[in-house]
Regions:
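Left-handed beta-helix
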Residues: 1-123
Length: 123
């Protein structure tokens, strides 16, 4: 689907503290709590979006959980979890069943498992 031509369609459940702006599609069985969805964007079915910001030109496939994080201009494939990320994720492609989370381990360090022909930009 071309996101810039998307129409507003909310099949999921948005609580009273969440808001949508622009063309936003939310699939059936998806729950959105205390979050901002700024379109154009699409969120698939059976997703959980909590305490998060989903920005424009983002496609989120089915069964994705995003908590306490921000993402825009990105594609997130099915069954991913993005949780407690302190910096906005942008211009990213995240594969199936990927888990991105803030580590509580010390000493603090970046840890990567990266596939062939990939690019990783770090702060």
């Amino acid at each position: 689907m071309v996101l810039s031509r998307a129409k507003r369609l909310l099949r999921g459940n948005l609580d009273g503290t969440s808001r949508t702006e622009g063309e936003v599609i939310v699939g059936a069985g998806t729950t959105v709590e205390n979050s901002i969805l700024r379109g154009p964007l699409i969120v698939g079915e059976r997703c959980v979006i909590k305490n998060s910001y989903i920005g424009p030109f983002t496609s989120i496939y089915d069964e994705v959980t995003i908590r306490n994080s921000e993402i825009e201009h990105s594609i997130v494939l099915e069954r991913c979890t993005i949780q407690d990320i302190p910096v906005r994720i942008e211009a990213s492609l995240i594969g199936k069943e990927v888990r991105i989370q803030r580590s509580q381990l010390k000493p603090t360090a970046y840890r990567f498992m990266v596939g062939d022909s990939s690019l990783v930009d770090v702060l």
